[in-house]
Amino acid sequence: MEPPYVDHYFDGALMHIFNPDTKENGGIFSQTQGWAILAESLLGHGDRAFEYFLESSPANMNDKAEVRILEPYVHGQFTESTRSPYAGRSHVHWLTGTGSTVMVGCVEGICGMRPNAEGLVISPSIPHTWDGFKIEKNFRGKHLSIDIQNPDHVQSGVKSMTVNGEAVEGNFVCEC
């Protein structure tokens, strides 16, 4: 929100009760980062999805620890924006859904592990520089060793895959 409200009163809208550039009054909320990762993945933009993951990673902000003022391994709910005297400071780190939305963006988006009623769709969207990756996953009582190779260095699309050492047709693992 730009510009933030500077007059404080409460009419039912939260933006009026917070200082400018914090929380709902112009702060930068983090929870949407996971959805951006997932959206780019679903569009097949593996490079951009992984770029968003890296940009939102708490570890990526360790060189700004004195500004961020949070543990180096947690997401904050929001970050104070540029007009704040504390621009870049993050808050409410143990009371946010950011970690879970980023996890969904990474697991279901980048790694492409999307469960449905019949089984598991595997449709990764990865950086074109990756040669592939392996995942060990327990899924509905079964252990899966999934090996995804990317010899053509594409960002999305599954030509073939192996699960528990056996070739699987398509990109679906049946629950049966």
Could you say what each language-model-derived stretch is?
Residues 22, 33, 43, 78-176:
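Carbohydrate-active enzyme catalytic cores, enriched for enzymes
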Residues 13-14, 27-28, 51-57, 172-173:
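Catalytic and substrate-binding regions of extracellular carbohydrate-active enzymes
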Residues 44-47, 56-64, 110-114:
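A generic secondary-structure signal for well-formed alpha-helical elements
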Residues 33-49, 53-56:
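Alpha-helical support elements that line or immediately flank enzyme active sites
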Residues 1-29, 61-86, 156:
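Extended glycan-interaction surfaces of carbohydrate-active proteins
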Residues 9, 57-67, 125-137:
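Short, mixed-charge aromatic SLiMs
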